[in-house]
Every structure is written in C-alpha cells, then in structure tokens.
Amino acid sequence: MSETSSNSPASGSKEAVPKSLAGSTSNIPNELFVGPDGRPLSQNAQGASKSSSKVVPQALVPEDDIRAVEGILNYGGSNDNRPVSHTHTFVELQKSHQNHLTENDRNFGTSRLDDVAPNADGVRRLRTSGSSTGLSNAPPSANVSKASSNLSLASLAKTQPERATPEVCVPLNPDTGSVPLIHPEQTDRGLPYAPDEKFHNSGSLKLPKGASLEDLSRSPSRAVLNEDGNVDECAPPEPWENEYNEVLDDVENAVVGTSPLEYTSKPLAANRQRSTADLTESDNICGLTAGKSDPVTDVDESQTIDEQSIPEAEKGFYTKDGEGTAGLPFDIVSNLDIPNENAHESSRSKKKHTGPSLSSASQPSAASSSSSSEPSNLDKINDVKKNIEVSANEPQPRPVKEDVPKSQVGGETDTTDVINNSTPKEETEESPSTELPETGKEQPPNKAEPAVPTEASSTKPSEAAEESTPRFSVRPNKFTGSRAGFVAALESRLQKGPLMRSFVPNKSKSPSGTKSPASGETSEAGVKETETTTSSESALPDARKSRARGPVRRPPTSVNTKPSFSVSGIDVFLNLPQSSVMKKKGVETRKEVEPKEEAVIPEEDVEVEVETEEQ
C-alpha cells in the first residue's frame, strides 16, 4: 500500500473524494472509503478507485456483521426466527413506560439506547447516524457484491426491511413513509412525526429584518411581515388572545391618557360577589367551605385577639391518615374508634391505663421475662382466633363479668376493651388477680392440656404484662371484631362530634415488658412518662397542629405499630430446613422448634419429641 501511495498524485485523491461527501460522513469515527472490490482504502492510496465511476462511503464493518452483532446483543443470538419488529429489546422494555417522551420531544436524532446503555450503542449507531448515504436499506440479499459475513446468523437477516424497526428514534411519517427533515423549531411539538408546518411556532422564528417595536408588542399571533413584506401565514388568534389584546390595548391607552379606564371604588355588583357569609352546601365541592355550612361571622375589630387563646380546630375533609373521605366533614369521619384496633392508641385509653394496676402488674413481667420472650407464632394465631370469636359473641356494651373467666381462657382476650369500659375501681380489683401466675408458679394452671407445666408458666407472665400495659400482642385486621360495636361508634359520632385530636405517636419503641429484665424496668418507666405527658398535651389541641393543612401523612411506622404476628421468609428459611437436617442426624430437635425459648403449644411439642425417639 505504501508504494501505491507514493505513486498516486495528491490531486487524484481530491478528485475521487469530493469534500462535501467526506464532510457528511465525518461523524462516523471508524469509517473508511471502500473501493469497488470491497477492500478498505486509506485516504492517500486510491489508485484502485479511479476505475470506478463513483466512490461510495461505506462503514468499515460490513452491514451484515452489524446486524448479526446487534441481533446477538438483543436476542442472545438464538437461531429461531423472531418477528423482529414486534420483539422488544430488553432495553426497550426497560424504557417502555417513557417511550412517548423519547420519541416525541427533543431527542429526535438519538437512539433509545443512549440513556440506558450508552456504550452498547456503538455498533448500532454505525448504521444510521449522520449520513446513511452508503448504507443501503435494501435487503442484504440485493447487494450481491458484499460477501455476507461469517458472523451473521441466517435467521437474523431481515427479510422484510420495511417492517424492521428503524434504529434511530425519528419515527417515519406515516403518510409518506419517509424520514422527515426536522427543523429545530419543530422539535418541541408533541407530534409523533414532523409535519410540514403551515403555522410556525412564532415564538421561535427569527424576526424579519424590518421588525418595528409595535410588531414586537403584539401578541404572538399578530401578523409578522416576512422579508417580502407579505403577511406570513400564521395561526388565527385564539379567543383568549383577542381578550388579552383588548385588555392590553385598554391599559396602553390608559397609560397614554387617551381613554381613561372606568374605575370605581365599589368592588363587584352584589350578585356577582362571592361572599363568605352565604356559602351553601353546594359550594362544598373541593372543600371550599371545609365542612361548615353555617355563615361565618364577620370579624369584629373591637375584639382583641389574646395571644394565649387556642383557636378551635378547623374542620377539614381529611382523615388523620390522609385519605380523602368522600366529602364528609371531619367530625363525622374523623378518627373512628374501630373496636379491637389498637395500633394507634387514643389519649383516652392511655389515661385509663395509668393507674395502680400498671405499677403493680409490671413487676412480675419484668422479673420473669428472662425466661420468656414473645409467645410463639402459633400462640399468636390462637390469640387472633380467640379475639375474633370473643368479640363476635359479645354485644357491644361489654359487661365486666369477663374478669372471672379470664384465667380459664388464659388471658387471651384483648383486655383493653374491657379496661376501657371499666371504671378505675374495677382496675384495682384486677391487679391482685394479675399477679396470680407469679405466686402459683409450680402448679399447672387450668389450661385445656396441662401436659407441660413449665412452658405454660412461662407463657403466663407475658399475658400479665399484656393485661396491664397498653401494648397488644395481636393486631387483628382493622375491621375484625364486633361489627355492632363499629356501627355504634359511628352513630355516637354522629350525635356528638369531638374536636379533632392531634395525633401523638407512642414514644416507646420496644414493646414494653417483653425484653430482657434490665430493659423491662426502664421501658416501663418510659411508658409511664410518655403516658403522663401525652395525657396533659392532648387535653388541649396544639395550636400549630390544629390547622387543617390538607392531607396529613401518618407518622413513620415504628416497631409497635407493625402487626406483631408476621412470618418473614427468613424465619421460615432458617428454622424449617435446619430442623429437618438435625432430625436426620438424630440430634434432639427441641432447639429448632423453639429457637428463642418461645412458648410452644404443648401438643406439637410432644409430637416432636416422639419423632426424635423414633429416628
């Protein structure tokens, strides 16, 4: 090649490759000029190309290779035929929710791949970027001169090129079937293809040479003269533009002093006024009157507002949790007490709990909690079941007669409902019975199956804690529990709507009384403190929080808000397979079944021990 380069005159190469062509190709980095035989030639040595009439710039990499590589990238090179136009690349799938963006605005020259996998695009870009002059869109079989590459899989050659997706995101004009030229002004239209524009975006057009100041002051649709002095075609003024122009003209005239604007100190005619006073229910759409249909009294200026006073909480349309209620004012829907729902405790129930019972009952739980951590999942399930049965069987106003059977039921009932309805006198009666399990530790309590006394006793104290503390072992589904109670709550709400309570989340992160003995005492103390503070705070609504500011978000969920009964995948994964392995080895399996010394239902325990003996 070096010899030929020395022989061939510089002029010859200039004739062969006109500047315009070379320029048009320049943005494809690895592109060379290819002679008629299909071999790449360097710019200097073009002796061979003189014989050919025209020199066509072509990609260095033959198109079949590009197609093959692209196919392998997109479809993993599999050999079966795919309808190429309908198969989405994984990249297209990635981006598919944004397709309308990519195709329509500002990105016309850019392939979809660019934002997702900028480098993956290198090969593909060769085909269509800049000048597609030499790269034929004809089916590869038509170019006989090119040898098809060894790379390409036969299945990937595009048999129907017109149906193949164009690689660059300029969509075809459906009418012409051609790639439209795109003028920069049109880029921001939201159109799927670039139309011939009769109406230009007059904002982005260049001004004609003779433009005068008044032309500039007109609204965008006023006629602008083009260089010939003729009026440009442009979109007819839209109705708002006319109004706008009239107003502008009025203002300009008023400034000049030609015609004064009519001006009165009177605001609007009474019938056109929208006053605060006479809003009716029909105005309530979109929360305009925020639930008040009664006229708002005018401000009396003689009254001073004393700074200490706390404004009455405004009624708004949003529930504490931020769902919009369907147009019902706050005091009907605000914070319903749904029976058995104890996730967020009201200040009322907290006040009820602080009493002699709390201090007395918390001690045993703290002492014995070393032996027991939270009752096992099975226990919790039973809890839920009993809860549901109990609450379904009982009429809403609950008699206090429950205190007696509690020892048989095993204290599984959700006690807070009882406590809420009972008076402090009854609470003091409860506290001795709560301490019972501690004193009678060795005797098997009367459960249905007293098979394993130690375990039953280890379950007891945590129940005692449950009775005395505002923490609940089980949070059943929001609407579980007596339906009647729910309706009753609704109806009582309808008669006397309480003001909105500002919601104070429970400060103690750990469920109290269940942790290790050391943490048990501290958490009890903490609970007492928070209870006293919250009861004093929530008596008066906080002035800052009482304004209704649209949907209030619920505070971030803390440990005690989460349902305490949940099986995570990891628990299952860790416990079950391990236990089976241990069984095979013949090792005692009790540890596996009961990893944290949790309480286990007696029947199951017996079965497990039997199994180990057999093996």
UniProtKB/Swiss-Prot annotation:
Entry superkingdom: Eukaryota
Pfam families linked to this entry: Aim21
Phosphoserine carried by residues: 149, 152, 219, 275, 516
Compositionally skewed regions (Basic and acidic residues) per UniProt: 312-323, 586-599
Region Disordered: start-end pairs: 1-61, 97-149, 181-217, 266-481, 493-565, 586-615
InterPro entries xref list: Aim21
Coiled coil residues, start to end: none
GO cellular component terms given for this protein: cytosol
Positions carrying Phosphothreonine: 276, 297, 514
Compositionally skewed regions (Acidic residues) per UniProt: 600-615
Chain intervals with Low complexity compositional bias: 356-376
Residue ranges with Polar residues bias: 1-11, 41-55, 128-140, 272-283, 505-522
Record has Phosphoprotein as a keyword: yes
Keywords assigned by UniProt, alphabetized: Phosphoprotein
Entry's Gene Ontology BP terms: actin filament organization
Protein name per UniProt: Uncharacterized serine-rich protein C18E5.07
Organism of derivation: Schizosaccharomyces pombe (strain 972 / ATCC 24843)
